[in-house]
Regions:
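Extended interfacial segments that mediate partner engagement and assembly in macromolecular machines
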Residues: 6, 22-120, 135, 140, ...
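DNA-recognition alpha helix
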Residues: 412-424, 434-440
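Short, charged amphipathic recognition helices of the HTH superfamily
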Residues: 405-418, 429-430, 444
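Phospho-regulated, low-complexity intrinsically disordered regions of nuclear gene-regulatory
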Residues: 410, 458-479
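Short Lys/Arg-enriched helix C-cap and helix-to-coil transition segments
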Residues: 444-454
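Short, aliphatic-rich beta-strand segments
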Residues: 70, 135, 142-151, 209-213
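Short cysteine clusters
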Residues: 12, 18-21
Length: 479
């Protein structure tokens, strides 16, 4: 584990063109330090942040692989990824973070196109058939689904094409044609046609079996997903007596895992296809204490609150944009005892935590989990609990004996420096600390604020150091 963390990452030959792995050339240990520091800067003021949970082997972890197809200047079929910020295709045969078998299948598909006279789709002319290929590989089951995204439902010799593909890769368990005839950048269309097999794969996670279709949302890193969801269930502290709501439930992953440890679980999701899969997943796992609804989660919670229904725990797993204030308002009105927030964006998480704090919810603990090695994303599980007015104790306080000076100072400049160096690895000056203090409305000595001459240029505290100093001030309860 330690040996792996300190070695330098192999540099990908298309790293600059692709742009998908922002941390190329950085050792895995450095990546983890960077991500943990980012989470700490944003969340330290809310509560306890645990060390980040990294991977033992941070390579080839993506069990969902997407390739876009195009033609080069000579008319040859190419497959790969879009160059960051463009729709120009960067040819890729293998990727250090993608499932190796999936990459092999994509190369085989590209090789079959010429013999079957299948043209790749051109976005400019809107001519051609094959637009994308999506591969999903069941980590625990080994099942493989191939999704061929075409611009037209007409797929000449499709049965022979599938036979030729399976001759090279007999491990493929199902092949689906997805029709996307829209002139948009969306990868998948709305219609699926099963060409071979059952049209979906299954995978196991935290003791539950899940049905995964072409359209299903399912986390792409199975090893870390197990850790992420186990941590979420552990944070909830379920004893078998709780009533639980799984908001943004998708295909029911968190809700079904929680069901074995709770009295009753309700899952709410707006996507109809996901709800259908969730219901099938409940039947597949013979889980009888869970019910799914195809509704807006916020409106659903408002109805529950109006009916005076009680909830012990709400799990929420919103998109990268975070939750909406409307949803958080509804959550506060329902007033569950605990909220477990699974976040894929620490910036929007911090924003939502500020809103929830105003509504009476305090973050207790946070666990960062590295779901995407070599990329700048980081997931975080956060436990919040309801802070009621009676969550107080009475004390006798003699104001005459209170030392106001010590209460105001809280921490010395050296203590702040030591904290910032220990927690963030940054060295800060007294000047920078005083600048941040002034921004936060804390009075400081004159010597730390004024230049020695009128024309002197005073250096301004960089944003990264300002955030770290603010975290220290919050730690010492000075802001």
């Amino acid at each position: 584990m330690e040996k792996n963390k300190t070695k330098k990452a192999a540099v990908c030959p298309v790293a600059k063109k692709c742009g998908g792995c922002e941390f190329q050339g950085m050792s895995y240990a450095e990546q983890l330090r960077h991500k943990e520091k980012r989470v700490r800067i944003l969340l330290d003021s809310f509560g306890k942040v645990h060390p980040i949970i990294g991977m033992k082997d941070p390579y080839h972890y993506r069990n969902k692989v997407h390739a876009v197809f195009d033609r080069d200047r000579r008319g040859n079929a190419i497959s790969g990824v879009y160059q960051k910020g463009t729709h120009k295709v960067v040819p890729v045969d293998s990727c250090m973070i993608e499932d190796q078998k999936a990459d092999e299948i994509i190369v085989t598909i590209r090789g079959l196109l010429k013999s079957f006279k299948i043209k790749t789709y051109d976005e400019d002319t809107q001519y051609g058939l094959l637009r994308h290929v999506l591969i999903r590989h069941g980590f625990s089951t080994g099942e493989i689904m191939v999704v061929l995204v075409t611009a037209s439902p007409v797929f000449p010799s499709k049965n022979n094409f599938v036979k030729a593909l399976r001759k090279v890769h007999p491990e493929i368990t199902t092949v689906v044609q997805n029709i996307n005839d829209r002139g948009t950048s969306m990868v998948l269309g709305t219609r699926d046609v099963v060409l071979y097999g059952k049209g979906f794969i299954e995978d196991k996670l935290c003791g539950c079996t899940f049905r995964i279709s072409a359209q299903s949302f399912y986390q792409v890193n199975p090893v870390q997903t197990e850790i992420l969801y186990q941590k979420a269930i552990e944070a909830a502290g379920l004893t078998g007596k709780e009533t639980v709501l799984d908001a943004y439930c998708g295909i029911g992953t968190i809700g079904l895992i929680a069901a074995s440890k709770a009295k009753q679980v309700t899952g709410v999701e707006l996507n109809k296809e996901a709800v259908r899969d969730a219901i099938k997943n409940a039947k597949r796992n013979q889980t009888k204490n869970i019910t799914f609804y195809c509704e807006d989660a916020g409106e659903f919670m408002l109805k529950m609150a109006a009916e005076d229904q009680q909830l012990d725990v709400v799990f929420m797993d919103p998109p990268r944009s975070g939750s909406s204030e409307v949803f958080l308002d509804c959550l506060a009105k329902l007033a569950p005892k605990k909220v477990v927030y699974v976040s894929c964006n620490p910036e929007t998480l911090a924003r939502d935590l500020r809103i929830l704090k105003k509504k009476g919810y305090q973050m207790q603990e946070a666990w960062p989990v590295d779901m995407f090695p070599f990329c700048d994303h980081v997931e975080t599980v956060v436990l919040l609990s309801q802070q009621k007015p009676d969550d107080t104790i009475e004390i006798d306080l003699d104001l005459d004996e209170l030392d106001a000076t010590s209460a105001e100072l809280k921490a010395t400049y050296q203590e702040i420096k030591d904290y910032v160096l220990k927690e963030f690895g940054l060295k800060v000056s007294n000047l920078y600390i005083s600048q941040v203090k002034r921004k936060c409305g804390i009075e400081v000595g004159e010597n730390y604020n004024l230049p020695k001459s009128e024309n002197a240029r005073v250096p301004q505290c960089p944003k990264e150091k300002e955030d770290a100093i603010k975290a220290a001030l919050k730690y010492f309860a000075m802001i």
